[in-house]
Design a protein with these regions (language model features):
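N-terminal accessory beta-strand-rich subdomains and adjacent acidic, glycine-rich linkers
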Residues: 1-119
Length: 119
């Protein structure tokens, strides 16, 4: 399964059999879904995210009303940061808070899959 990363657009393109799965890193932190379907050779942003004023949605950056986690097609949404949809996971911290703020750090693409000890 080829995995291609476009550094200039911060786009991951996974190809498997007859399908493609495409994700992008936005705002240096959030992994968003762009495409899943029939295998394509390259992504030309035909299904790109539309950035428009989200005045009635929570904006993590008060100076950018076009960005809201509540409308972003996140790959792994979390709770407590302005996204009111169901989260992908839940936690409870020692202080009782259920809010988390996970973000993308980096990636590594390896050839093949790693061997699992004992299998």
């Amino acid at each position: 399964m080829p995995i291609v990363y476009d550094k200039s657009r911060k786009i991951f393109h996974l190809q498997a059999g007859d399908t493609s799965y495409i994700m992008q890193i936005v705002k240096e932190k959030y992994l968003v879904h762009l495409y899943w379907g029939r295998r394509i050779s390259s992504y030309h942003e035909s299904r790109r995210i539309i950035w428009k004023d989200r005045g009635f949605a929570p904006n993590p950056d008060a100076s950018d009303r076009t960005f809201s986690l509540d409308t972003l097609p996140q790959e792994y949404p979390q709770t407590g940061n302005g996204d009111f949809r169901n989260p992908a996971y839940g936690i409870r911290q020692e202080n009782g808070s259920r809010i988390s703020n996970l973000g993308y750090i980096g990636y590594e693409i390896s050839d093949g899959k790693p061997k699992l000890p004992g299998l």
